[in-house]
């Protein structure tokens, strides 16, 4: 794998997030048109729309995570407050993403059971099944990014809390810890790009 700098990793991930959002828009438009034929698509369509909102919120958050500076977090209460706010937002995004994963699975299976259990070669079902698998795979990878971001913000907050107890050693020890955590996060971003599902450009 070619060496990538942090900005390339970030740009590539944001590009993928954008394409994932477009895929969800495309699929929800398709299912909207089919609701009249398959009414149970209504709930599945709504879940796709809600999932798209997650992707639309992600680029800004990824940029903020990539800009975390451990030294600033140690010496600035304002910076640590912003990091704590990111941690709360990540908690919400992790929970919301898991809800989307679970609900999409539930509603897709309901559509499958109601309409296609005996007709799995149906052209629309085959198309929907393929798209749905891509969406679920993408959401799981998105959640792994949020999990990595939460780990980073949690540990930075802990570093800030401990600085008062160990101020003489905190800079060297915890700056190194911060670098290690950032490597964990960027490694997840690389995984996100390298092993992304194939997303149709149609």
Curated annotation (Swiss-Prot):
Keyword Transmembrane helix: yes
Superkingdom of source: Eukaryota
Keywords: Membrane, Transmembrane, Transmembrane helix
Gene Ontology CC annotations of this record: membrane
Its membrane topology: Single-pass membrane protein
Chain ranges passing through the membrane: 175-195
Record's subcellular location: Membrane
Protein's name according to its UniProt entry: Putative uncharacterized transmembrane protein DDB_G0288997
């Amino acid at each position: 794998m070619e060496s990538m700098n942090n900005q390339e990793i970030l740009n590539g991930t944001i590009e993928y997030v954008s394409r994932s959002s477009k895929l969800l828009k495309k699929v929800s438009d398709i299912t909207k048109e089919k609701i009249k034929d398959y009414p149970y698509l209504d709930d599945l369509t709504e879940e796709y729309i809600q999932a798209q909102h997650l992707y639309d919120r992600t680029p800004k958050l990824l940029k903020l995570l990539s800009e975390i500076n451990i030294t600033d977090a140690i010496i600035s209460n304002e910076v640590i407050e912003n990091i704590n706010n990111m941690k709360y937002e990540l908690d919400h995004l992790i929970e919301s993403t898991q809800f989307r994963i679970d609900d999409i699975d539930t509603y897709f299976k309901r559509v499958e059971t109601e309409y296609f259990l005996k007709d799995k070669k149906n052209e629309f079902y085959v198309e929907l099944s393929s798209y749905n698998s891509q969406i679920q795979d993408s959401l799981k990878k998105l959640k792994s990014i949020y999990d990595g971001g939460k780990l980073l913000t949690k540990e930075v907050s802990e570093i800030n809390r401990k600085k008062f107890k160990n101020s003489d050693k905190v800079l060297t020890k915890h700056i190194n810890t911060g670098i290690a955590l950032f490597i964990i996060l960027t490694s997840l971003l690389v995984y996100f790009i390298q092993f992304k599902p194939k997303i149709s450009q149609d």
